[in-house]
Amino acid sequence: MNVPVPPPPDGVLTGPSDSLEAGEPTPGLSDRSPDEGLIEDLALEDRAVEHLVGGLLSHYLPDLQRSKRALQELTQNQVVLLDTLEQEISKFKECHSMLDINALFTEAKHYHAKLVTIRKEMLLLHEKTSKLKKRALKLQQQRQKEELEREQQREREFEREKQLTAKPAKRT
């Protein structure tokens, strides 16, 4: 019985030879090419670079993040200060111009008078709507009452017609 044997790897002799024994690599056939180890070296270098970058990031990143937060806070504070300064400057400009202040007072009086008239009109409209609602309610109640009376009148007429219809007399 003959069992098939898998082929030997490249460069390995399986049969007898005068100078080599079985299983030893053949000289010249298993020599590595000069580019063969570069891929493995690149993979090792990539891992080393990743570890170095990770170490640098873990060392400097917290400080950089704190600095970033501090700068953001300072920037926000600076914006708030600038806004406050602009408001104060505008207040001083308003205070220095008396004509503008007088114009503001007259404008305020004008708008106050408008508000008073609008309020009076709103009160009048409220009173009118209240009266209209009461009147509408009375009319609705009156219509319901009339409808009820008509319905009762129809029922009475129906009963009267019912009584007026001929009924057979009872035999005794």
Swiss-Prot record:
Oligomer and partners: Homodimer. Octamer composed of one copy each BLOC1S1, BLOC1S2, BLOC1S3, BLOC1S4, BLOC1S5, BLOC1S6, DTNBP1/BLOC1S7 and SNAPIN/BLOC1S8. The BLOC-1 complex associates with the AP-3 protein complex and membrane protein cargos. Interacts with BLOC1S4, BLOC1S5, DTNBP1/BLOC1S7, F-actin, SNAP25 isoform 1 and isoform 2, SNAP47 and STX12. Component of the biogenesis of lysosome-related organelles complex 1 (BLOC-1) composed of BLOC1S1, BLOC1S2, BLOC1S3, BLOC1S4, BLOC1S5, BLOC1S6, DTNBP1/BLOC1S7 and SNAPIN/BLOC1S8.
Compositional bias per record (Pro residues), positions renumbered to this chain: 1-10
Residue stretches of biased makeup (Basic and acidic residues): 143-164
Record lineage: Eukaryota, Metazoa, Chordata, Craniata, Vertebrata
Functional description taken from the UniProt entry: Component of the BLOC-1 complex, a complex that is required for normal biogenesis of lysosome-related organelles (LRO), such as platelet dense granules and melanosomes. In concert with the AP-3 complex, the BLOC-1 complex is required to target membrane protein cargos into vesicles assembled at cell bodies for delivery into neurites and nerve terminals. The BLOC-1 complex, in association with SNARE proteins, is also proposed to be involved in neurite extension. May play a role in intracellular vesicle trafficking, particularly in the vesicle-docking and fusion process.
KW Membrane (keyword) present: yes
GO biological process: actin filament bundle assembly; adenosine metabolic process; amino acid metabolic process; anterograde axonal transport; anterograde synaptic vesicle transport; ATP metabolic process; blood coagulation; bradykinin biosynthetic process
Cellular component terms (Gene Ontology): axon cytoplasm; BLOC-1 complex; cell-cell contact zone; contractile ring; cytoplasm; endosome; filamentous actin; focal adhesion
Pfam (any one): Snapin_Pallidin
GO MF terms, alphabetically ordered: actin filament binding; identical protein binding; molecular adaptor activity; protein homodimerization activity
Keywords from the UniProt entry: Cytoplasm, Membrane
Family under the similarity heading: Belongs to the BLOC1S6 family.
Designated gene of the protein: Bloc1s6
Signal sequence segment: none
Entry protein name: Biogenesis of lysosome-related organelles complex 1 subunit 6
Residues forming coiled coils: none
Keyword Metal-binding: no
Localisation: Cytoplasm; Membrane
Protein topology in the membrane: Peripheral membrane protein
Predominant cellular place of this UniProt entry's protein: cytoplasm
Region described as Disordered: 1-35, 136-172
